[in-house]
């Protein structure tokens, strides 16, 4: 209990399989910075996934034992095609990591939180209008109630499986702080 395991590497995403998929046999949380899996020791100040299509495709797909993820786990502000497709599909997370990118790429968030039945909080800063081109079924099967925070300048109004989940409360991030509301710990990051 309380043990930590660290991963880093300089992995190259392969078309349609990304860098691989974790299998978790015990309940756990994911923390740190996912960019360390792509850039090794040079992950700090890396905010672009340009040229890294499928980067984190299905990274935790089907990991029902994944219960939480730190708010700053996915710091990329420049996305690539399919980069987060199915990343958390069928996990048990309650709070999504902050999604700071303002411009979406093709299928970047497709099925990202598909069937995450416990998910009830998403903070997504994109100003691109969500649609099947970018966010196909990204929130299908999430909790029937929750809070969705979007960028103050995001003027889109899309609800349902490709946008803000139906029946969720919608708020705006006035300061674009990247911190989460609810379960917070030191510096506003997720804690349990």
Residue spans of the language-model regions?
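Extracellular/surface-exposed low-complexity segments
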Residues: 143-192
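Surface-exposed, short loops/turns at beta-strand junctions within beta-sandwich domains
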Residues: 1-2
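A structural signal for leucine-rich repeat
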Residues: 136-141
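Register-specific detector for alpha-helical tandem repeat solenoids, activating on a conserved position
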Residues: 57, 85, 110-111
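Structural signature of tandem-repeat unit edges
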Residues: 5-7, 15-53, 61-80, 89-106, ...
């Amino acid at each position: 209990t309380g043990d930590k395991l660290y991963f880093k590497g300089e992995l190259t995403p392969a078309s349609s399989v990304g860098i691989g998929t974790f299998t978790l046999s015990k309940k756990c949380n994911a923390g740190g910075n996912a960019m360390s899996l792509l850039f090794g020791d040079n992950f700090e100040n890396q905010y672009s996934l340009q040229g890294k299509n499928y980067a984190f495709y299905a990274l935790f797909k089907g990991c029902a034992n994944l219960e939480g993820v730190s708010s700053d786990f996915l710091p990329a502000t420049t996305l690539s095609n399919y980069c987060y497709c199915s990343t958390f599909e069928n996990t048990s997370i309650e709070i999504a990591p902050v999604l700071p990118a303002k411009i979406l790429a093709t299928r970047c968030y497709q099925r990202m939180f598909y069937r995450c039945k416990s998910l009830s909080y998403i903070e997504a800063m994109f100003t691109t209008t969500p649609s099947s081109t970018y966010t196909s079924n990204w929130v299908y099967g999430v909790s029937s109630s929750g809070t969705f925070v979007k960028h103050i300048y995001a003027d889109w109004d899309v609800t349902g499986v490709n946008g803000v989940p139906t029946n969720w409360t919608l708020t705006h991030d006035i300061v674009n702080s990247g911190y989460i509301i609810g379960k917070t710990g030191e510096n506003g990051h997720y804690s349990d």
